[in-house]
């Protein structure tokens, strides 16, 4: 593994941890030359899964798009990057468990919303506004009302 600071090839692993899903290994590394420390992640890569978009197009599944959407929804909240990464891992695991080679973007959005609802209500409403394509303020109020009723 190359050091991101000096480009040296020689690094050592200081710590390794498997996440709760058992699908990701987090490694803390140190460069033997410059002593810089950095984190790497190893994830299981599953076969090609395609996402069916609303307009019918098919795109190769890309976990970074899920993370990007979650990060936008969680902006200026107390949700940590670690919590966001865990949610992405959970969504990916749920997709893998189906064994399907295709999944609709709507199904992915539903999985993300379920996870965000447990993590942060503000992020949930933000994500819902994009996922459900809100056009009116009443749509926001309806989602907030649903959240309040669930408590």
From Swiss-Prot:
The answer to whether the entry has keyword Transport is no
Which biological process annotations from GO are given for this protein? Answer: negative regulation of DNA-templated transcription
> Which residue numbers delimit the ATP-cone domain?
49-139
Kindly list the organism's lineage.
Bacteria, Thermotogati, Thermotogota, Thermotogae, Thermotogales
Report the family membership. Answer: Belongs to the NrdR family.
Alphabetically ordered keywords of this record: ATP-binding, DNA-binding, Metal-binding, Nucleotide-binding, Repressor, Transcription, Transcription regulation, Zinc, Zinc-finger
Q: Which metal ions or organic cofactors does this protein require, according to UniProt?
A: Zn(2+)
Q: How is the cofactor bound, in the record's words? A: Binds 1 zinc ion.
Q: What does this protein do?
A: Negatively regulates transcription of bacterial ribonucleotide reductase nrd genes and operons by binding to NrdR-boxes.
Q: List the Gene Ontology MF annotations in alphabetical order.
A: ATP binding; DNA binding; zinc ion binding
**Which residue stretches, if any, does this entry annotate as coiled coil?**
none
The yes or no answer to whether the keyword Lipid metabolism is present is no
Designated name of the protein? Transcriptional repressor NrdR
Tell me one Pfam family matched here. Answer: Zn_ribbon_NrdR
Which residues belong to zinc fingers classed as unnamed?
Answer: 3-34
Give the domain of life.
Bacteria
